[in-house]
Amino acid sequence: MKHVSAPPPVLDELLKTTALSKAIKFDLPITAPYHAPHLYTAENVNTILCGVDDVVATTIIPIVSSSTGTVVTSATFRDALRVAVEACLQLMIRSDLIAPGIASHVQHADGFAIRHIATAPDGLALAVQTALSQAGGRSQSGRVNAPDQNDTTSIPNALSTPRAKAKIAILSMSGRFPQAPSMEAFWHVLENGIDTHELALASRWNTRTHVGDLSLKELPKNTSGTGFGCWLHDAAQFDARYFNMSPREAPQVDPAQRLALLTATEALEQAGIVPGRTSSTQKDRVGVYFGSTSNDWMETNSAQNIDTYFIPGGNRAFIPGRINYHFKFSGPSYTIDTACSSSFTALHLACNALWKGEVDTAIVGGTNVLTNPDMTVGLDRGHFLSRTGNCSTFDDGADGYCRGEAVATLVLKRLDDAVADKDPVQACILAIATNHSAEAASITRPHVGAQQDLFASVLADAGVKHTDISYCEMHGTGTQAGDAGETTSVLQSLAPIEPPNAVRKQHQPLYIGAAKSNVGHGEAAAGVTSLAKVLLMLKKSTIPPHCGIKTKINHKLPDLPSRNTAIAMEAVSWPRPVNGKRQVLLNNFSAAGGNTALILEDAPEVPTLDVPDIRQCHLVAVSAKTPASLENNVKNMLAWLDEKSDASNLTLARLSYTSTARRIHHPHRVMINATSLDSVKASLRTALDLKKGSSRPKGTPRFVFAFTGQGAQYAGMGADLFAQFTGFRADISRYDQICRQLNFPPVRQLFEDPTTFCDATPTTLQLAMVCFQMALYRMWVTLGVTPSAVVGHSLGEYAALYAASVLTQADVINIVGSRAQLLEKHCEQGSHTMLAVRSNAEDLEAALGPSGLTYELSCHNGRESVVLGGTKSQIETIRPTLQRSRMSNRVLEVPYAYHTSQVEPILASLAAVARGVHFAKPAIPVISPAFGTVLTQSEDFGSDFIVKHCRNKVNMLGALQAARQMSLLDEKMMGIELGPEPVVIKMVKEVAGPAFQTFASSRKDEPALNILASALSAFYTAGTDVKWTAYHADFPSAQVVLELPAYAWDLKEYWIQYVNDWSLRKGDAPLVIERTTLEGTCIHKVVSNSLGVSGGELLVEADLSREDLHPMVQGHKVYGVPLCTPSVYADIALTIGEYAKQFSGEGSTKLGVEIANMNIQSALVATSDGKPQMLRTHASYDAKQKSLYCTFSTLDDAGKVKEQHSNCLIKLFDVEAARTALKSSAPAIKSRISILQLQLNEFGNTFRYSKAMIYKMVGQLADFDPKYRALEEITLDSDALEALGRVNFTKVSAEGKFHTNPAYIDALSQLGGFVMNGNEGVDLDKELFVNHGWASLKLLEAIDPTKTYTTHVKMTEGTDKLWTGDITILDGEAVVGVFGGVALQGVPKRLMSYIVHAASKRTNGVAPRTAGEPQTQRVTAPEVVSAVVKTTTKQLVTQAPVEDRSITTAISIISQESGVEAADLTDDTSFDDIGVDSLLGIMVSSRIRDELGIDVDSAAFLEVRTVGSFKTFLRGLTGTTEQFTTVTKTVTKEITPTELRESSFAQSAVAGDSFGVWTNVLAILAEESGIDVSDLTGDTYFSDIGVDSLLSLVVVSRLRDEFDLDLPEQSLFIDYPTVASLKARITGCTRSPSVFSDSDATTDVPSVFSPSLEVETTSEDFQPLAFSKKEALVAVAEVALTPLEKADPFMSIGLASYVESLQRHQPHGPYHLAGWSAGGVLAYAVAQELMATGEEIATLTLIDSPPPTDGLDRLPRRFFDHCSAVGIFGGEMSAINPSNKRAKLPEWLMPHFEATIELLHDYCAPPMPLTTNAPKKINLIWAGGCAFGGKYAPLPPASMVGEDTEGMKFLTEQRTDFGPDKWTDLFPGRHIDIDVVEGEHHFSMMRGKGAQQLGGFLRKTLGLLA
């Protein structure tokens, strides 16, 4: 049997040969080239052995060589290894010699036994056994298998520790602890001795109902005796988008699981773990181990409404499973439950897995989030819990533990792996063990003996003396017996008092402590919480104070001082010993009897590297998943750099290493290329200002690798890369070895010593060039940059073939070396040369052809770049002619004239060399200049290729153009030159386009590391996954992981509140429970309700026309207009507030509802026509403030907010506290009441008014409905404006369901209004006072309609005639309520009349138009005209300014109201000067709203202070600009109906069921995912928003059930990963009918024209475009695009609609298509779509259309603004729509422009194939002028660099080249007719004289002219 190895393609060919075709063969799992002497040299062997010392060693067991069969003799270990390495790499295995060799060696031994240990193949083993038996050996029975080797990708180094004895390194830790959302915050709690216990948070459960009264003999069912705990206040916060979780799923996921994700991610980040970066972080070698002991969330919270994610969200097995799933780890995941020791048990399992080699990295943690009150009740009833507060560890009064919450995660590796991977190490675990207290008196009690056994075990396993332990972190739950028992076991083990040699010396103190006294007992997370504390202690070198002893130390503890043991009552310094380590014992036990303990020690000290980092430029990366997180990450980095500027370990190189190689990178990216830390900070600030990284790359960029040709070499090329990069140096060394093996000159010296360059032969230089390029290729690939296509110039094409896997390295070197040697042998150096000329081939021929000069065209590099070749004399002869023709030229420094006849003598020999080469199929396309095309098949290569490559001219331009046409090259790609200088890549850019980014690999006189840094920075920000570890590999001093700021999460709260205390009633008989409801007389429907403990919103509505509410809202009539009183809003707010009390966490009886800041914004008039009139109330709950902000608005018929009338703030207040406060003010109020009553009997101005008199007194102001007349009498002091009233509700109807009847509220508040409108000093004919709301309404008890109440108020004047007063409400002597800050505004009577009647008109008449509201555009079909139509042509004579009617009317209103003549209201008139104050502003704005329908805020007159600025302001609202009138003379012309019909454009409106379906699909997606519809943009990835397989099932099921859409359940969101792709799929499923015009379907020449603007069909401007009766010009209006649809795929939506519309008019071709501007792009796309279906295109006309080779550039907003401002859109476009001259642009126009451009932005049109159904004639019509060439003001310069795009220049710059431009690339090989509309620009060519020229060109194209 023979073993044969070779490269796979070669081996395949070998096995196909006749000799081996029938041989028995099988593959071996060997994929490296072993036993290959042609590949390896002695130098390779020495490289492998370079780390092995040459130590003398004696061989104990003889080693028999597998190559010779003889015993290896070696004096040193290094020699023995050399023999082994040589046998592996260079020598053949001689199985036939092994067995005889062994037998020969042992044959002289006196009797020996043979025992087979199975380490070799059975055949070889049998041969050896047979040979030994023949030599006299005795066979022993049985077979011993070799030790089982666990698979691991870790390769231990010579100094590594055996795996089973390795220390376990803790790399990092992250956690959430009570009052500590981070590790640093946790240290703050510890070092300050903070006790974090408090009553249960309202988000957990209501302590008032769940904590029983301890004074009772027996606690109520399911209540506990304590409400204390240590809580995570931010447990609800989570970044769902980061973890691809939908807002629907996130609340259902247990907060413990969510926090485990957050902390695991933070821990991995701090550890610098990038999955897959090293062998120990391969995803299948990572395991996750978590301790968790309860399922609170799914038992209590999510179980209240079980949904799709109930199981994966709540089951604790998903805690580690979710981490594995998110990071795609495929190692084991375990959830461990051993009660209180769960997390330490998980840690134990993880350590065991590391020691056994089951995993190489372990993620370990514990979680404890308490939301189920039952667990607390059970623990309390089991006497576990303290009823007095926190864990009082070591306290004499300790009475149990306090439950605590925590989630923490740490990352572990074996120490050897961590050191090898340059990981940060915080501490090391030496040993960990677990046992059980089997002998304990109770299962829940620990056993001293068992714990002592455990401590002895871990100390022995760790090899640590008990006196070396300087600190013990106790379990320390806080019971007298438990603390005493644990302390006894610890001290007996660590600080015994006998025997004497075991006693601690004075310098060996032991400290004990427990974190539970600070943060409670974290139960399943208790162990990792203690570990977090100790890690912080090691980091801070401090033992924090113990805060558990509240009274005195537990008297049951052993005597501590006698054992040199102490409890730190204040912070104690704990420095690391010099040249030593601190060692700690941590103890953790379980209520179920388990005990776990571990030994921890300091991390090994990291040696300082003195090797400097020679790089000048360093790259610093910041990335995030969302723009918000990116911004905060940058800010955090800046703050960190400021804080750590003096840190000793902070260097720019280490910052670069940590932020690049040791971070997982996200889509939103910022990269800084800096030379100092200060420049990093400056660049980060710039990135913030410019919002860099706010948009994410749309994908990974594609690269073209360009390989330099001959002539660019220079001395020192690649020298710095050779010196600085090990991989590059190794590649060059390997190529040098191949060169020598193939008998070519060596090349390595050119990279080591640049001085050797001068003496190098052409062969050496050419070999060095291709070796350099191949090494560069491997360098880029190592860095993660791979090409999608390659191109090489001349010699560089060989390296390109290697990059494309066509040739091997050896084959490239063989061909290039042979070619060069043949040239040296057969061609004379220096006899020929080459000349680079700046010209195109045609002009060159024109210049040189007539002269008869001889030359050869060697290279066609670009449109204006060619290279000539010939003899030196030929070249010198033609140079003068070229200079006379102004063709710049340069002689190239080359020894031969390549690609000319000079090389012909070598072609036959070169072909012979090539025939021995294997050419493989290209792995990527090869853009081949040798053939001027793209090569993709193995058949494209061979010996013939090599010959033609040598002789043919280099047609670089043709090859690149071919690649462009095949879409293998475009300007969105990136290009890298692989060679000494960036030469070829410039040629690529010329064809690819100006946006094509180019990068060099090397430049003369520029450090290669700087070049590399610049390129990688660009690649990274474009989305490339750079292999940063390789980038930093050769710079060891940089490889230190810094503790950078944690990821800035984009946190939102997700919480399901436990409600209604249902846990208290488990097992009870069903009860009819009265729930707080919202519906009533003033609230008819709950639209939506998300109120909860953490916040939320509520939307309710009421129909004011409904019979139960309608009378209430017509209670006050002012000037005959029924107005709704604020009391209606108050009742709604009180109802909402009462409902919200259940979420406050307080008892409902304790809290009252306050209606604060009631602000009346506008009058609400109730209609009387019986039609529905909806009042909507929106309430937003602020959980922290316990308040709700409310707005009250009416809706229009479409359900949209029409007008907001009022707003207020609902507050929850403590009733008893408010009662106490009011009680203190009651005496003063009662005193004032008494004084008023006494004044009635004295001479003065105080009078009492009866009920009849009260309402009669204000009758001319307001008519009160009887139900609102509850004031029985008032006593009024007109001088003091003070009054008291008596209120009685016996005559007020009690019908209806209210919180507080609005009539009651209104009556109690009326006193203030009567004081202001009924005092003797008021003149109601001139002025009156209206209610503007109040500051506060508090009712301490419900209003009793059977009682009589007293009210008191005193009004005081404020500013601007606003009067306020506090109305106190008394029930007898008791104050039961107060209206604080009741506000009444003085208003002129006529203004009030305006306000009221304007409100009435808005409600009952035509509502005024709100400024800026989009207006519906009505498109009508052309009418059938039966009479002569007169058209007019207006000829310009003069222009004069004229004001818009709205402006003149507004000025007239100001004139009338102010009394100032309109003529005097000039632009510079100040409103202050003419007395326009806030009140007059209200009147003016009211009239403008009423008469003009323009909604002007009265506050505008306080901000806009002059008439001129007011006009500008008003124009902004109406969308108009200052206009000019045109004085014209009019010519009338009659047109017949036939002529009119023939000249008109028929509009087509695209409507479609598909978009309706899509809208519903969006709604389902939003509903099921919880994402707002507005966030479902086209580029949204479903995976990013958490649409997983479960949600996919739900969505697909609903689509099937509701819309009969049959979509794949499992793969829908895999096949269509973005919103845009799904929309294309959905809209493609459903039909999109179009309405087409009824134009003459029998016409001979149908054409399609695609205008971008609305065109009025009667416009004479377009008459020249009309054809004769038998010819129809049909317009298909563009698809009405909106911003929502702008990101959708073009082909699937807009294009389909065009084609459908066209084929409704004309089912089949031939078609004549035309389009103007972007419409030309659409016409081109429609043509291709029709051709694809087999339809024929007769003609295609493109009218001033930009070529869509690379999509259309976006136009900046300032372009549109400028066009509007100078009149292009207001003037030119009005000519297109003459009936609306100078009018405001349609609302749809700008969005349509922008959406069209956005639609076509990514449409890179493919070339049109040259098929039989392609257009027979292609016509391109350019506009001859430019709009900004004089007629209109030029566009001002951009304020930002890069804002002006090439696409904008198409419209803003005068065209000078009227050729086909880039359209020629889209019609390869086709002739394009070109016409120019002279004297017209882009926007005017479609009308008037432009249209006359255009019509002629169209007729010519259509063949309608003779």
Swiss-Prot record:
Induction: Expression is up-regulated during the late stage of P.nodorum wheat leaf infection and is controlled by the cluster specific transporter elcR.
Positions of region (Product template (PT) domain): 1081-1397
Catalyzed reactions per annotation: 6 malonyl-CoA + acetyl-CoA + 6 H(+) = nor-toralactone + 6 CO2 + 7 CoA + 2 H2O
Known EC number: 2.3.1.-
Disruption phenotype: Abolishes the production of elsinochrome C.
Name the record gives this protein: Non-reducing polyketide synthase elcA
EC main group: transferase
Cysteine pairings via disulfide bonds: none
Carrier domain ranges (all copies): 1441-1518, 1552-1630
Organism per entry: Phaeosphaeria nodorum (strain SN15 / ATCC MYA-4574 / FGSC 10173)
Matching InterPro entries: AB_hydrolase_fold, Ac_transferase_dom_sf, ACP-like_sf, Acyl_transferase_dom, Acyl_Trfase/lysoPLipase, Ketoacyl_synth_AS, Ketoacyl_synth_C, Ketoacyl_synth_N
